[in-house]
A protein has these predicted regions:
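Glycine-rich, positively charged N-terminal anion/phosphate-binding segment
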Residues: 6-15, 19, 32-50
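Catalytic-face loop-and-helix region of soluble metabolic enzyme cores
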Residues: 182-230
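Hydrophobic faces of well-ordered beta-strands that scaffold small-molecule active sites
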Residues: 1, 24-26, 54-58, 83-85, ...
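Active-site mouth loops of central-metabolism enzymes
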Residues: 1-7, 55-66, 122-136, 214-227
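Conserved small/polar residues in nucleotide/adenosyl-binding loops
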Residues: 232-234
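Glycine-rich, proline-tolerant flexible connector loops at the mouths of alpha/beta enzymes
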Residues: 21-40, 89-98, 153-163
Length: 234
């Protein structure tokens, strides 16, 4: 299927198949406006050619209701009916559309337009960057769940204690759906620095910072140490 992208992605997916993952999620970016050309074909390939359950990301801040409805039909036609419903990042200088200002708006629309879809929501153990505080953030998260999310997946984090604290607060708020932890191994220094710059709300514990400094000029050892820490993290 030539539409699914470059050979590196296909080879990586073939390797993953041997691990029998519970699912693979397919990302989408607001910067390209090309969900139909990238996300849908790749999700189709994973779901049908590789027989791995697939979740399609759907950031909607720059999409109209008509575009989202079309995307849902295209995904449904290839048997992909699990969605990670996202507002999506706002692009500096590009005015968002008004149909989906919040992820909750998208979740409510999907429930009405395609009730057979399983909707997953995003959550932020260390707080959404746009939220004034964690209490407000968890209140908004409860709205997502009430709107129709069957489960939640977290933004990546490196401090387990902050995740456990977040879980406890969600329980107190009446959020009773499964919360899946987002784990990303540190594989190289540039990746880690880029993540910290992009996700300014994320706390990097001292042990993670220590390996970045210790193996600054030894990329192979940094990769090995990053993977080992991720296994402990899990």
């Amino acid at each position: 299927n030539p539409a699914v992208g470059n050979k590196k992605i296909l080879l990586a997916l073939d390797d993953m198949k041997g691990s029998a993952p519970h699912f693979i999620s397919v990302t989408a970016s607001n910067n390209k406006y090309n969900i139909k050309e990238t996300t849908v074909p790749l999700a189709d390939h994973i779901q049908n050619d590789l027989a791995i359950p697939t979740i399609a990301h759907l950031p909607a801040i720059y999409l109209s209701k008509e575009k989202v409805a079309d995307t849902l039909r295209e995904l449904d036609a290839v048997g992909v009916n699990r969605i990670l419903a996202l507002r999506g990042d706002i692009i500096p200088g590009v005015e968002p559309l008004k149909d989906f200002r919040y992820a909750t708006d998208l979740i409510e629309f999907i429930k009405a337009e395609a009730p057979n879809f399983d909707i997953i929501g995003a959550c932020y153990p260390e707080g959404h960057p746009d939220s004034p505080n964690q209490i407000s953030d968890i209140q908004n998260l409860k709205k997502k769940v009430d709107a129709g999310c069957s489960s939640l997946v977290t933004q990546l984090f490196f401090d387990n204690e902050r995740f456990y604290d977040f879980q406890d607060k969600c329980t107190l708020a009446g959020i009773d759906v499964p919360i899946y932890a987002g784990i990303m191994p540190i594989l190289n220094r540039n990746q880690a620095l880029r993540l910290l710059k992009t996700c300014e709300n994320i706390h990097l514990p001292r042990k993670f910072r220590a390996i970045l400094d210790k193996y600054e000029h030894d990329p192979e050892s940094l990769r090995a140490a990053g993977l080992a820490l991720s296994l402990i993290h899990i």
